[in-house]
Structure formats: structure tokens, C-alpha cells
């Protein structure tokens, strides 16, 4: 094999190894977004019956 082919193989191996280490930061961001979504869902779950009750009183 010539040098160019070896260089490409080594570069691809390095990119694969470095690319997998980035998942830690993305995982943390995903967890934060998931937590925010859960809080919004829980707040909406608590508020919707109150809103529905207020609409029923207005009729």
C-alpha cells in the first residue's frame, strides 16, 4: 500500500474515535432538554383541568 492509502485509513480511524467521544456533550444537552420537556408537560397537566374548569364556568 502506498502512503496515501495508509494515511486515509489512519485518518478515518482517528475520526471514528474522536467522533464517539463527542456523544458525552450531546448526551448532557439531550438530558437537559428532556428535563425541560418533562417540566413543561407536568405543568400543562396540572394547569389544563383548571383552564377547562374556568371555561365551563364562563358558559
Swiss-Prot record:
<keyword id="KW-0732">Signal</keyword>
<comment type="similarity">
    <text>Belongs to the cecropin family.</text>
</comment>
<keyword id="KW-0964">Secreted</keyword>
<dbReference type="InterPro" id="IPR020400">
    <property type="entry name" value="Cecropin_insect"/>
</dbReference>
<dbReference type="InterPro" id="IPR000875">
    <property type="entry name" value="Cecropin"/>
</dbReference>
<keyword id="KW-0044">Antibiotic</keyword>
<protein>
    <recommendedName>
        <fullName>Cecropin-C type 2</fullName>
    </recommendedName>
</protein>
<dbReference type="GO" id="GO:0019731">
    <property type="term" value="P:antibacterial humoral response"/>
</dbReference>
<dbReference type="GO" id="GO:0050830">
    <property type="term" value="P:defense response to Gram-positive bacterium"/>
</dbReference>
<keyword id="KW-0929">Antimicrobial</keyword>
<dbReference type="Pfam" id="PF00272">
    <property type="entry name" value="Cecropin"/>
</dbReference>
<dbReference type="GO" id="GO:0005615">
    <property type="term" value="C:extracellular space"/>
</dbReference>
<keyword id="KW-0399">Innate immunity</keyword>
<comment type="function">
    <text>Cecropins have lytic and antibacterial activity against several Gram-positive and Gram-negative bacteria.</text>
</comment>
<feature type="signal peptide">
    <location>
        <begin position="1"/>
        <end position="23"/>
    </location>
</feature>
<keyword id="KW-0391">Immunity</keyword>
<dbReference type="GO" id="GO:0050829">
    <property type="term" value="P:defense response to Gram-negative bacterium"/>
</dbReference>
<dbReference type="GO" id="GO:0045087">
    <property type="term" value="P:innate immune response"/>
</dbReference>
Amino acid at each position: 500500500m502506498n502512503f496515501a492509502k495508509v494515511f486515509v485509513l489512519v485518518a478515518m480511524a482517528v475520526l471514528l474515535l474522536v467522533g464517539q467521544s463527542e456523544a458525552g456533550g450531546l448526551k448532557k444537552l439531550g438530558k437537559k432538554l428532556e428535563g425541560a420537556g418533562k417540566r413543561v408537560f407536568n405543568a400543562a397537566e396540572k394547569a389544563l383541568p383548571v383552564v377547562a374548569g374556568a371555561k365551563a364556568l364562563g358558559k
